[in-house]
Amino acid sequence: MKRDIISVYDMKDDLEDIIELSIKLKKDRTIKFSEKKILAMIFEKPSTRTRNSLEVAMEQLNGHAIYLNPNDMQIGRGETIADTARVLSRFVDIISYRAFNHDDVVELARHATVPVLNALDNLEHPMQIVADFMTVYEKKHRLKGLKLAYIGDGNNMANSLLLGSSILGVDISIACPKGFEPNKEILRQAREISLKTGNKIEITDDPRIAVEASDIIYTDVWVSMGEENERENKERIFMPYQVNEDLTENANRDYIFMHCLPAHRGLEVTAGVIDGIHSVVFDEAENRIYSEKGIIYKLLS
């Protein structure tokens, strides 16, 4: 039976196993598919890390990745997502989809007969979460009991971090302006999981409260792709949520700073923080390769 990863929630039973597999694949690059596998990558949004890491991941696994831009496909001229899913399922072994609309990813997965990966949409960014917590484990040598502070917009990254933290037993405190909180249904799912794993979940509008005694500080862009018309207003609202040297004084001395990138220095984070000794953002970016290898190998082997 085929398995999709549309949400971090889809990994609630084996996220830790996937992280362990990703670390193993990073250490041993001789592990590959015995038969060539093909990935179709549909990108409605631009990409640096996701596209290139998926291509490298497939190459290292004895596979191949095909880049598909909707403007070059019949889907851009009115062909349905359902028909696109059915056709691609005859051609390839697995599909990744970076979409503006979460419902479109769900629709593709519903009609595809091969696994579908959410490569980022307006609600979640599940593959990033595997890379993130893989990186945390490499740096901290544990996950359960750590505290992660997320500062900024309650966007797709905040949603996915909520779920990932709850599954792995990582305490999470999210600081965002009122009206920009994470998705309510995802927060409900995270709280439900936390009843089993025991992690603490906090939503606040005070970044200092969130960062207090944290092991990980995470931020993301304030203006997501497709929200460019909101830039001026959001930058004004979010400036008090900038991760800067003053704010990080409230964290543990050995905290690590994370960002899924691309970053805007001087907005959500200062250059001093993202380019400083606590930053692990480029290790985090590199681990996109190995985390995606782990996910794909898990689904196809």
UniProtKB/Swiss-Prot annotation:
Binding site for carbamoyl phosphate: S47, T48, R49, T50, Q74, R98, H125, P126, M127, Q128, C260, L261, R288
Catalytic activity, reaction form: carbamoyl phosphate + L-ornithine = L-citrulline + phosphate + H(+)
Entry's EC annotation: 2.1.3.3
InterPro entries: Asp/Orn_carbamoyltranf_P-bd, Asp/Orn_carbamoylTrfase, Asp/Orn_carbamoylTrfase_sf, Asp_carbamoyltransf_Asp/Orn-bd, Orn/put_carbamltrans, OTCase_ArgI
Annotated S-S bridges: none
Keyword Chaperone: no
Region forming the signal peptide: none
BP GO terms, sorted: arginine biosynthetic process via ornithine; citrulline biosynthetic process; L-arginine biosynthetic process
EC top class, as a word: transferase
NCBIfam families recorded: orni_carb_tr (TIGR00658), PRK00779.1 (NF001986)
Protein name: Ornithine carbamoyltransferase
Gene: argF
